[in-house]
Amino acid sequence: MADSMQLAGIVLAGGESRRMGRDKATLPGPRGAATLLEYVVGVLIQRCDPIFVMAAPGQPLPEVTARIIRDEIRGQGPLPATGRGLRAAAEAGARYAFVCAVDMPLLSPELIDDLVHLATETNAEVVLPWDGRSHYLASLYRTDLAERIDRLVAGGARSMRALIDASDAQQIVLPESRFLANVNTEADLRALAQARA
């Protein structure tokens, strides 16, 4: 566990993957991982316990060392899934959770360490990396934000930006932003494969 903080991990894997045209969770993973989901969970296991995977109803997933939580309704966006994950993490005793997307093939435990360090210093509700833009789905969230998310969702909000705007959020500028790379298209996937070759 990072800095002895009770830290859960939440992987958002239930997105529609419209630009990719197929489920990102089952795309080939880097560094020997069979799939992206297995890779991301493997990174989180190094710093987080427990780990929750937020998935779409009926979405086929590979076997991973994580608890799978299915969305009740498909296509609601990341905010409701994050809220459900934070609630599960709070019930498991975690004060913070690292929330990330499944499509992060360069994710590293060092990113989590940097976020935990700032959270420990500031007690912020949200700590998010910034590299010219904010990365909501590679951030640390306090688990007690689940109720605030419920209120935002009840009011019609679906974007993570709504939560950030309603929270005490701290940003950290990362010297190495490649850990934040994600894959949204087949071209992104090919570029990643070429970079690894």
From Swiss-Prot:
GTP binds at L12, A13, G14, K24, D71, D103. CDD domains: MobA. One of its GO terms (biological process) is Mo-molybdopterin cofactor biosynthetic process. Mg(2+) binds at D103. Its EC number is 2.7.7.77. Its cofactor is Mg(2+). It comes from the Bacteria. It is an enzyme of class 2 (transferase). GO terms for cellular component: cytoplasm. GO terms for molecular function: GTP binding; metal ion binding; molybdenum cofactor guanylyltransferase activity. InterPro entries: MobA-like_NTP_Trfase, Molybde_CF_guanTrfase, Nucleotide-diphossugar_trans. SUPFAM superfamilies: Nucleotide-diphospho-sugar transferases. The keyword Metal-binding applies. Keywords: Cytoplasm, GTP-binding, Magnesium, Metal-binding, Molybdenum cofactor biosynthesis, Nucleotide-binding, Transferase. The keyword Cytoplasm applies. Transfers a GMP moiety from GTP to Mo-molybdopterin (Mo-MPT) cofactor (Moco or molybdenum cofactor) to form Mo-molybdopterin guanine dinucleotide (Mo-MGD) cofactor. The N-terminal domain determines nucleotide recognition and specific binding, while the C-terminal domain determines the specific binding to the target protein. NCBIfam families: PRK00576.1 (NF001855). HAMAP family: MobA. This is Probable molybdenum cofactor guanylyltransferase. It comes from Mycolicibacterium paratuberculosis (strain ATCC BAA-968 / K-10) (Mycobacterium paratuberculosis). The gene is mobA.
